[in-house]
C-alpha cells in the first residue's frame, strides 16, 4: 500500500504540472510555437505517468499496471485477511491519452516541379490550320486561354484551351489534352478536342511552370505495400508542405507525398531521391510490420500511423510490441475541449485511490495494534497460568517432602523400640 501510494504521489505531481501547462495554454497571447512547446511537455508528463504506472512494483507484483486485488493475511486462521483493491492508473484510464492544447495549422501543399521553363511544342501536330493558328494564323490569332495549362489530378492529365481562331478555323477553338515533359515543355500531339470541355476537377497552372516531379517506383511500391491501390498510387504527387499558424506565421513543413486527401511525410535522400517516412512495429500476432507516416494529429502536421483502424503518434508506435506490451494511447485528432475539467477529473480519480490506500494502511495499523494487544494479553495469561501451575507444584512438592520426612521419623522411632527391649534383656 505504501509503495503504491508513493507512486500515486508522483503521478499526482505530474498531473498538477499538466494542469499548470493547460492553464498557460488557455492564454490567447500564446503563439502557435508556444502551444507546441507546452504540448511537448504535456506529452512528456503523460509518458512519465505511463512509465510509473507500468514499472512500479512490490515484490515483483506491478501495482498500477492493471486492476488487481491483493489479499494480505493478518491473522492465524483462514479468512483473517485484508484485501487491497488496486486500479490501473495511466493516461488512458485517466482520460488524458488524447489531451491536446495545440491549435490546428493551416496546411498547404504545393506540387514539386522539375526545373526548366515551358514552351508549347506543336511539331507533331498534323492539323496545319491549328498548328499555324497556335503559332499565329491568318484567320484570327490563336492563344492558350489565360496563358495557362490545366492539370486534372483525378486522371493525372494536362489540358489547354485554344481560343481566338475565327472564320473557317473557329471550329478549332476548344479544349485539347497535352503532355508536359520534365523540362516543362507542353506538347500538343492531337487535334481531337476533349468532349465536354475542360474537366471540372482540373486546376490551372501557369504555362511556364514545369511538370510536377513524378513519383519514383520505390515510392509507389511503398504506397501499394501499405494497401493503397496501384491506380491511386499512380496519381500520387510529391509536394512541399507549409503551415500557417493562427498569427499568420508560415513555417516550412518539408516534403510529402499526396494521395487523394491524405499526405504522407517524405524525406529527400542524399542521392536526390525521395522516400516516405515509415514506422516499424510488432503487431498482435508477433509479426514485424511497417506503417507509412501520415501528416495529421490535432495540429495537422504531426506524423501519425494507422494500425488496426486506430491512429497513433508515429514516435510512440515506433518499435512498440502490440502483442507483449499494453495498448498505446491513440493520437489526439483535435484540440481537447475543457482540458482543465478533464485534468481535474483525473486528479479526483487519483485522489480516490490514494484515499482507499490510506484507509487500508490505517486498517493495517489497527490490525497490527490489535495483534500486539492479543499477543500481550495471551503472554500475560500464559504467565499467570504458569505461575499458578508452579505454585501448585511447589505445594505438592512441599507436602511430599513433609510426608517423606514424617515417614522417616516414624520409621526411625519404630526401629528404636526393639533396640530398647533388647537392651533390657541383656
Q: Can you name each region flagged by the protein language model?
A:
Residues 81-342:
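Cysteine-poor, low-complexity segments in flexible/peripheral regions
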Residues 1-118, 164-165, 317-426:
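Primary detection of the long, small/polar-rich alpha-helical "axial" segments characteristic
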Amino acid at each position: 500500500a505504501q509503495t503504491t501510494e508513493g507512486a500515486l504521489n508522483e503521478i499526482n505531481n505530474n498531473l498538477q504540472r499538466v494542469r499548470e501547462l493547460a492553464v498557460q495554454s488557455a492564454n490567447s497571447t500564446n503563439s502557435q510555437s508556444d502551444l507546441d512547446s507546452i504540448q511537448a511537455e504535456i506529452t512528456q508528463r503523460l509518458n512519465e505517468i505511463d512509465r510509473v504506472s507500468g514499472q512500479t512494483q512490490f515484490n515483483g507484483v506491478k501495482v498500477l499496471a492493471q486492476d488487481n486485488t491483493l489479499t494480505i493475511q493478518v491473522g492465524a486462521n483462514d479468512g483473517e485477511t485484508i484485501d487491497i483493491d488496486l486500479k490501473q492508473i495511466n493516461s488512458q484510464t485517466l482520460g488524458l491519452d488524447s489531451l491536446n492544447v495545440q491549435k490546428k495549422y493551416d496546411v498547404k501543399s504545393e506540387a514539386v516541379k522539375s526545373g526548366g521553363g515551358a514552351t508549347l511544342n506543336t511539331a507533331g501536330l498534323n492539323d496545319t490550320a491549328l498548328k499555324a493558328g497556335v503559332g499565329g494564323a491568318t484567320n484570327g490569332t490563336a492563344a492558350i486561354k489565360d496563358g495557362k495549362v490545366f492539370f486534372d489530378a483525378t486522371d493525372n492529365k494536362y489540358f489547354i484551351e485554344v481560343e481566338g481562331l475565327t472564320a473557317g478555323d473557329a471550329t478549332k477553338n476548344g479544349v485539347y489534352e497535352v503532355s508536359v515533359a520534365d523540362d516543362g515543355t507542353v506538347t500538343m500531339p492531337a487535334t481531337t478536342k476533349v468532349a465536354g470541355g475542360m474537366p471540372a476537377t482540373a486546376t490551372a497552372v501557369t504555362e511556364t511552370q514545369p511538370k510536377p516531379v513524378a513519383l519514383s517506383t520505390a515510392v509507389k511500391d511503398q504506397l501499394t505495400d501499405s494497401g493503397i491501390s496501384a491506380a491511386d498510387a499512380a496519381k500520387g504527387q510529391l509536394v512541399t508542405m507549409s503551415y500557417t499558424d493562427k498569427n499568420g506565421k508560415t513555417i516550412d513543413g518539408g516534403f510529402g507525398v499526396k494521395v487523394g486527401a491524405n499526405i504522407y511525410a517524405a524525406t529527400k535522400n542524399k542521392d536526390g531521391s525521395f522516400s516516405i517516412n515509415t514506422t516499424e512495429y510488432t503487431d498482435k500476432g508477433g509479426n514485424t510490420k511497417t506503417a507509412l507516416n501520415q501528416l495529421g494529429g490535432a495540429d495537422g502536421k504531426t506524423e501519425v500511423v494507422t494500425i488496426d483502424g486506430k491512429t497513433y503518434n508515429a514516435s510512440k508506435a515506433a518499435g512498440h510490441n502490440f502483442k507483449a506490451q499494453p495498448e498505446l494511447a491513440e493520437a489526439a485528432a483535435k484540440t481537447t475541449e475543457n482540458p482543465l475539467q478533464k485534468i481535474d477529473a483525473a486528479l479526483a480519480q487519483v485522489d480516490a485511490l490514494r484515499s482507499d490506500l490510506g484507509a487500508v494502511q490505517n486498517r493495517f495499523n489497527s490490525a497490527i495494534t490489535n495483534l500486539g494487544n492479543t499477543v500481550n494479553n495471551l503472554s500475560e495469561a500464559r504467565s499467570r497460568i504458569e505461575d499458578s501451575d508452579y505454585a501448585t507444584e511447589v505445594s505438592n512438592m512441599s507436602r511430599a517432602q513433609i510426608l517423606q520426612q514424617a515417614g522417616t521419623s516414624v520409621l526411625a522411632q519404630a526401629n528404636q523400640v526393639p533396640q530398647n527391649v533388647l537392651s533390657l534383656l541383656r
